Amino acid sequence: MKFLIPTAKEIKEDNKPYPQHLSQKSQILVNHMNALSIEELEKSYKVSPQIAQTELLKWQDIKNGEALAYPALYLFNGLMYRHIKRQHLTVEEKAFLKEKVFITSALYGIIPALKPIVPHRLDFNTKVKIKGESLKNYWRKTYDNFVLDNPSIVSLLSSEFEAVFSPKLRNQLITLRFLENQNGQLKSHSTISKKARGAFLTQVIQQQTKTVDELKTISFNGFSYQDNLSEPLKLIFIKQSK
C-alpha cells in the first residue's frame, strides 16, 4: 500500500540543501518554462510582473543547475504538512515514510516524500502547454503507470491532483473523506480536510498501517471511521461535534 499527498504553495527553506536532480521529463518542462517571456509567465501564473520576473530568475537557476534542492516533505509547509509528523521520527517511521509515502508534483511527477526538489511555483492550475499538452495531460501517463505498478494506493490528494489520473485508474484509488458532524449536519471544507489529511497520515506512519482494514481502525482528533457511510474504496471519517 502506497500513500499519495499533494504539493503545497507554502514552502520553508530551512533544511539542509542538496544538489538538484531532474528527470528527462522534468528537464523538458524546465526548458519550456525558461523559454517563456515575463509577460507569458505573468499570464500563466496570474501574478504581477514583479513576481513573474522573480519566477523567471528561479527557472533560470533551475535550468543552470544553480538552484538548491530540499527534501520535499520538509520543503512544503502548507496546512496539511504542518499536521504531519516530520520531526523526531523513529528509524521505523522514517523507513515507512521512504517506502510508502509519495508526493504528486506538476514539475517532478510522483516522487518519494524525501526526494530533494527545488522550490517552485508550478502547479496543475498553471496555464502552460508542454508540447501542446496541458500539465495534467503531460503527466497523465506517468501518473497512470504509478497506479498500474502499485495496485493499492491511498489518495490524500485534492481534486486538482486526482484529475491528473485517467478516469478508469482514478476510480481504483482508495479515497478518504473527513467530515464534521455539526448539529446533525455533516460538513467539510478545505481547512478541515487539510488538517485531517495531515493528522491521518501521522497516524498511518506511527502505526505502520499497511491494509485497508487497518486504515479503518484509525481514530484521531475526534475522527473515526463510519462503515455505514463508506464504500469499499471510499472511506468516510466523521468527527462528532461537542
UniProtKB/Swiss-Prot annotation:
GO terms for cellular component: cytosol. It holds the Pfam family H2O2_YaaD. One of its GO terms (biological process) is response to hydroperoxide. Belongs to the UPF0246 family. This is UPF0246 protein SMU_2070.
